Amino acid sequence: MIAQISEFRMPRYREIPDVGLYLDQTVKYMNRYLAPLGCMEITTSMVSNYVKKGVISHPVKKKYSREQLASLIYIVLSKNVLSLENIDALFQMQRAHCTAAEAYDYFCDEVENCLPYIFGASPVSYTHLRAHE
C-alpha cells in the first residue's frame, strides 16, 4: 500500500472531465481515483444525498460538471473529519476568495504532500517544532 501511496497523484482540476458525467459515470470516476487511498467507495445514493442537502449543486440535464466532481473529491476526503455543514461552509468561504480550480488544485497539492507522512512512507521531522521552544 505504501508503494501505491507514494505514487498516488490526484487529478488536477483541468484533468477532471469537462464533458458532464451521468451519476453512474461520476461514481465510477470517483471510486477509480480514490481507490489507492483505501477510502470507502462513494455510491450513487451518497452523491444524491449531497445534492439534496445542497452541499453540491444539482446536475444540469442529469450530468455532473468538473466543478461538482472536484467538490465530490473534496467531500469524500474530508467527511471523516468534517461535518457536511462544515464542508458546505468551507465551500462558501472558498467561493468568496478564489476559483474552484485554484482551491481544488491547492487541496490536491496539500493532500499529496501529507500522504507520505500519514502512511509512514516518510519520517516525520520535528525539527521545526524544536526551533520554537
Task: Please give the residue ranges for each predicted region.
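Basic helix-turn-helix/winged-helix DNA-binding cores
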Residues: 1-95
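Non-DNA-binding regulatory cores of transcription-related proteins
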Residues: 100-120
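Conserved small/polar residues in nucleotide/adenosyl-binding loops
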Residues: 127-133
